[in-house]
Amino acid sequence: MDLLRLSRLFSGPHPIGLSVLQRLDLLRSTQWTGGREGPAWLRAASCSSSSHQKRMSSLCSDSSTPVAPQEEEEEESFGTLSEKFSSRRIFHKSTAQLYNLKLKEQGVEEEELEPRLRQGGRNTPYWYFLQCKRLLKEGKLAEALDLFERQMLKEERLQPLECNYTVLIGGCGRVGYLKKAFRLFNDMKKRDLEPSDATYTALFNVCAESPWKDSALQSALKLRQQLQAQNFQLNLKTYHALLKVAAKCADLRVCLEVFKEIIQKGHAVTEETFCFLLMGCIQDKKTGFRQAMQVWRQMLSLGIKPSRHGYNLLLGAARDCGLGDPEVASRLLLTSQEETILLQPPTGRRLAGGKVQAKTRHGVSVKHVEALERQLFLEPSHKLEGPPAFPEARETSRTQPEVETKAEPGHMGALAPLALKPPDLELQVNLLSLGALSPAVVSFGTVATPADRLALMGGLEGFLGKMAEHRLQPDIKTLTLLAEVVEPGSPAESSLLSILDRHRVEADITFFNTLIRKKSKLGDLEGAKALLPILAKKGIVPNLRTFCNLAIGCHRPRDGMQLLADMKKSQVTPNTHIYSTLINAALKKLDYTYLISILKDMRRNSVPVNEVVIRQLEFAAQYPPTFDRYKEKNTYLEKIDGFRAYYKQWLKVMPAEEPPHPWQEFRDKPVRNQVITENAGGLRDG
């Protein structure tokens, strides 16, 4: 009877026993999680239910009763899990090591993106702007970029402002980091931030300071085209940055194109504008000095007061550039002012600081700038062209006779170098002024050296006198440039130290390095060494450039070896430039014994070799083109053979110098040992 009742419980369309067992299984699964066991009565009930289930399964297998619906559903669902894998064609192997590696990488990424806990509230974008500005003033561009990109964007996930990008682009501009600056600019546009005038000024400035001039010029011209397509109006400061790009990366013609655009837009022409034109003149090494004098005289004709920076640019032109064709220079610089001055001051009111209002500028127009351009690039066969639209100037030129190019034999003189002119003529020649020159000066003579070009500007005293007329005092850069252009070994060079004290200018190591280099080039090594006690008296410490300038005059082996020994005593390690200078001094004397001694010392100090040194040594290892080894014995050729044998072995053991990338120091991420805190308003060790 009991078996019949049990069979009825587990048979039929809706067996009651199976539902009870399912409820018990559900209760067991919910309460026995985590390896915990239930009470004893529940375990006994489960055991009894399992035994009953086994009995019924055996009874069902013996009898011909149909299969339960739940078992039918389980049979139907068997094998359906493989459907989502059956469509795959490629299977990746997965091991425990790969899984652990994946977890480690995820942990590193989460650690990088996890914001650091800071004291105080959350920082603002303007606070980050101030911190980046402070770091850039300290010359820490890499730290400023890391602070912006890692801490502000990744860790705190703040939305940057336009000023955050502009200050970093400006920092990149100071060092010429062109690639990073345009990356920041593109990221700025992706965030829908509107660039300001300061942003475009910083972008043009980074193009001007880039070490790769061609690519920088292309980037600047492309940016200029984009701004023109957007009809974006540039201010004068941005135009000056564009003018700086043209002066440093292009030539004077491109500068004049920008200059004409500045006038077309109605901007005021300032002294800074002409300074950038002077920088463009310096790019022409052949005729840059003559062009610089023309631009200078046009600036003075507008009544614009020059600055100390403008005088320094003139000295740079005298040092690096030539006068060009003497006939053209005589026609442009020695003729009457009415024929050569094309930019006239306006009749309206003049602003303070030398600026001219655009609305009242009657003398400066695009037509006159084009005439100035034709004069700047005048060829010997071309005819001198006067101002195109100055009726007042034309009437004056009709009433006054032109300056004669021919004079009486007793009054004719050529503007020759300073040492060849009479003493009274030296004081009358100064092209820096707009006044007429002496009638005795009708043409230029040989102007080949920087000292000759300085003589055209009145010499040392005349140049400083012109600065005094404009109430300008020379700085250390002015005196350093004067030291480079004065006649070597002249009294003017000796008077530079007294001028230094007279104007109370604090000397630096660059000024004394210039004097030491000039004396060493003359072969006056003792005179160069005599300047070292003056350095010590003024508290100036010599640097590697000082020893390199001394090495120029070490033509004898004992002088060169003594210099290396003195550097060792001073605990200064010679670099590649010093050894290259000594090698050059030995090559001028064809002293192979001296050359081998230099290479031995270079090997002892393990100084890496650069391309310049290799070219020097390859030239030293060459045989004379017309020598015959078997004709007769030649001691000179034997020395070359000895040097070639040592040079071959020397190359095998010497390290090579890899030139550093200009932007490498900014690409390296700084060590993350400092955290910005709001409490101190700066950096704090974290």
UniProtKB/Swiss-Prot annotation:
<protein>
    <recommendedName>
        <fullName>Pentatricopeptide repeat-containing protein 1, mitochondrial</fullName>
    </recommendedName>
</protein>
<feature type="compositionally biased region" description="Basic and acidic residues">
    <location>
        <begin position="392"/>
        <end position="407"/>
    </location>
</feature>
<dbReference type="GO" id="GO:0032543">
    <property type="term" value="P:mitochondrial translation"/>
</dbReference>
<dbReference type="GO" id="GO:0000049">
    <property type="term" value="F:tRNA binding"/>
</dbReference>
<dbReference type="GO" id="GO:0005759">
    <property type="term" value="C:mitochondrial matrix"/>
</dbReference>
<dbReference type="InterPro" id="IPR002885">
    <property type="entry name" value="Pentatricopeptide_rpt"/>
</dbReference>
<feature type="repeat" description="PPR 6">
    <location>
        <begin position="508"/>
        <end position="542"/>
    </location>
</feature>
<comment type="subunit">
    <text>Associates with mitochondrial leucine tRNAs. Interacts with ELAC2.</text>
</comment>
<feature type="repeat" description="PPR 4">
    <location>
        <begin position="235"/>
        <end position="269"/>
    </location>
</feature>
<keyword id="KW-0819">tRNA processing</keyword>
<feature type="region of interest" description="Disordered">
    <location>
        <begin position="55"/>
        <end position="79"/>
    </location>
</feature>
<feature type="repeat" description="PPR 7">
    <location>
        <begin position="575"/>
        <end position="609"/>
    </location>
</feature>
<dbReference type="GO" id="GO:0042780">
    <property type="term" value="P:tRNA 3'-end processing"/>
</dbReference>
<feature type="repeat" description="PPR 5">
    <location>
        <begin position="270"/>
        <end position="306"/>
    </location>
</feature>
<keyword id="KW-0496">Mitochondrion</keyword>
<feature type="repeat" description="PPR 1">
    <location>
        <begin position="124"/>
        <end position="160"/>
    </location>
</feature>
<feature type="repeat" description="PPR 3">
    <location>
        <begin position="196"/>
        <end position="234"/>
    </location>
</feature>
<dbReference type="Pfam" id="PF13041">
    <property type="entry name" value="PPR_2"/>
</dbReference>
<feature type="region of interest" description="Disordered">
    <location>
        <begin position="383"/>
        <end position="407"/>
    </location>
</feature>
<comment type="function">
    <text>Mitochondrial protein implicated in negative regulation of leucine tRNA levels, as well as negative regulation of mitochondria-encoded proteins and COX activity. Also affects the 3'-processing of mitochondrial tRNAs.</text>
</comment>
<dbReference type="Pfam" id="PF13812">
    <property type="entry name" value="PPR_3"/>
</dbReference>
<dbReference type="InterPro" id="IPR011990">
    <property type="entry name" value="TPR-like_helical_dom_sf"/>
</dbReference>
<feature type="repeat" description="PPR 2">
    <location>
        <begin position="161"/>
        <end position="195"/>
    </location>
</feature>
<keyword id="KW-0677">Repeat</keyword>
<comment type="similarity">
    <text>Belongs to the PTCD1 family.</text>
</comment>
<feature type="compositionally biased region" description="Polar residues">
    <location>
        <begin position="55"/>
        <end position="67"/>
    </location>
</feature>
